[in-house]
Amino acid sequence: QESRSKAAREKLLRATIELLAERGYAGLTTKEVAARAGFSNGALMHHFSTKADLVIAAGAHIYERHIEEGRRIAASPAARTDPLKAFIADCENVYLGSSFIPTTEMMVAARSDPLMHAPFDAFMRDYRSTMNDIWMKAFMRAGYSEEQASFTIMSTLYIVRGMAINSLWQKNLPYYRSFLREWSKIEKTGALKKARATIR
């Protein structure tokens, strides 16, 4: 029974994420999510009583997966030899991958919805704090000082986030990747060695 319930939740969350990408938050209905997942609307309500509950759970699901994947990348042998390249790969997955549009839809909705704002803010803060900790350790394990690691993480994040916003209307992954390769080359010259930033 428990495994069936978990499988049903997974299907409903997956359908929610797909429909957020296709129709946006405003166009999302619990009825359509239930149909996409192969359930009745009543069955959906057994797991999620409101649209807000469903979307919050879908957001948490996405970021839990991002933490798992980020942890795997940060622990890989590649991250020990080139942590920046590994970190860029993780950032691409989060900000330039298929989950970015659904999570952006969630963020915009949560910004002004009092029922969604607090829980969404909580798991977003947990995600960022967890990933900062994981990647700080990965960079420092590869020989970066704490100051270097902080600056490299934050500056790379801001670059990729800007690309992510641009990608909402102008998709150009090859260009973004070429730009990130150049950024990586600049960082590796040591020209930014004395730069400082607070990890956030």
Which residues does each predicted region cover?
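Amphipathic alpha-helical packing segments from all-alpha helical-bundle domains
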Residues: 67-68, 72, 93-104, 114-140, ...
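Residues in soluble alpha-helical coiled-coils and helical-bundle/repeat scaffolds
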Residues: 49-53, 57, 75-78, 111, ...
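Hydrophobic/aromatic-rich alpha-helical bundle segments in the mid-to-C-terminal region
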Residues: 115-121, 138-200
